[in-house]
Amino acid sequence: SEINHKELNGMQKGAWLEVLKGQFPEKAKDEIKILDIGTGPGFFPVILAEAGYKVTAVDYTQEMLDTAKRNAGNLCERISFYKMDAQNLEFEDDVFDVVISRNLTWNLKDPKRAYEEWCRVLKPGGKLLNFDANWYGYLYDEEKRLSYEEDRKSVESEHLDDHYLCTDIDRMEK
């Protein structure tokens, strides 16, 4: 999709790569075993494979894995793709140096079970990097609400598209 393409070619790609690399063990790239859970369109595996890492990517749906493979293109040789449930991983214990996930936890039926699984497949001393967001914290926190309103003003003053304006919270909470 256009969003995937922008993200994979935008400035945030380098920022994400630096954040991730800063958490990796100090050993050769080929020796670091990385698992991306809920890979979606394959953002993390693609940027990591471009940087010379080998990555295992899992997702619950074949459609997302197919999208990730398309996005990876010739980088697929550095990425292993598996259809798998994030809450019931089919890997042995203590396999990965790093487990990463982005924008997945809030979609899971049983996040506690997922975290148990993710920790199970991590090697002792491994790193679990979970990036998730509370997109609607501004509805419950006055400080976040003020920040949200300031962001809306900034977007308007820069004449940018504001995708937050059409969110129907009442419908989502039903």
Predicted regions and their residues:
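A short glycine-rich, Lys/Arg-flanked "PGG" loop and its adjoining helix->strand segment in the class I
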Residues: 112-124
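A short acidic, Gly/Pro-enriched loop at the edge of an enzyme's catalytic core
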Residues: 87-98
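Short alpha-helix
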Residues: 174
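Class I SAM-dependent methyltransferase SAM/SAH-binding core
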Residues: 35-37, 41-88
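Short N-terminal helix/helix-N-cap motif within the alpha/beta-hydrolase-1
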Residues: 63, 108-113, 138
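A short SAM/SAH-binding and catalytic strip from SAM-dependent methyltransferases
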Residues: 98-111
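Conserved class I S-adenosyl-L-methionine
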Residues: 1-30, 43-47, 67, 127-163
